[in-house]
Curated annotation (Swiss-Prot):
Organism phylogeny: Archaea, Methanobacteriati, Methanobacteriota, Stenosarchaea group, Methanomicrobia
Coiled coil segments of this chain: none
InterPro entries in alphabetical order: UPF0212
Pfam families from the UniProt entry: DUF555 (PF04475)
Organism of derivation: Methanococcoides burtonii (strain DSM 6242 / NBRC 107633 / OCM 468 / ACE-M)
Protein name: UPF0212 protein Mbur_0968
NCBIfam families in alphabetical order: PRK03922.1 (NF003035)
Tree of life domain: Archaea
Family the entry assigns: Belongs to the UPF0212 family.
Length: 114
């Protein structure tokens, strides 16, 4: 059995915000509030990075229209004693998905560690 570091991305909708910084703060706070009661404080939450198609500069994954933001969050957790990287990603999606119901999740990276 092997240990894995699994990275997921989540699409988080935030209403009634005017700036990208406000949207990021609210999204991270709301995600934390939903993870902590389930004792998932080991899940790292951060804003994702998107690259500009024109200049390739990185910027925070936030899009705002009509005071509603779509924030791309990155969720990271370690999975111990998984049979494969596929098994580790299923475990991570299941654990995080139970706390973040109705939030789209996608696996972006699975890395083995000792």
């Amino acid at each position: 059995m092997t240990n894995y570091h699994v990275t997921l991305e989540a699409a988080w909708l935030v209403r009634d915000v005017e700036t990208a910084d406000d949207a990021i703060g609210v999204a991270i706070s709301e995600a934390g509030k939903r993870l902590n009661p389930k004792k998932l404080d080991f899940v790292e939450v951060d804003v994702g990075t998107t690259y500009c198609p024109a200049c390739s500069e990185p910027f925070g994954s936030v899009f705002i229209a009509a005071n509603t933001a779509l924030v791309g969050l990155v969720l990271e957790m370690k999975v111990f004693d998984a049979e494969s990287d596929e098994h580790a990603s299923r475990i991570a999606k299941s654990v995080i998905g139970k706390a973040l119901t109705d939030v789209p999740l996608n696996v972006v990276d699975v890395e083995e560690f000792d």
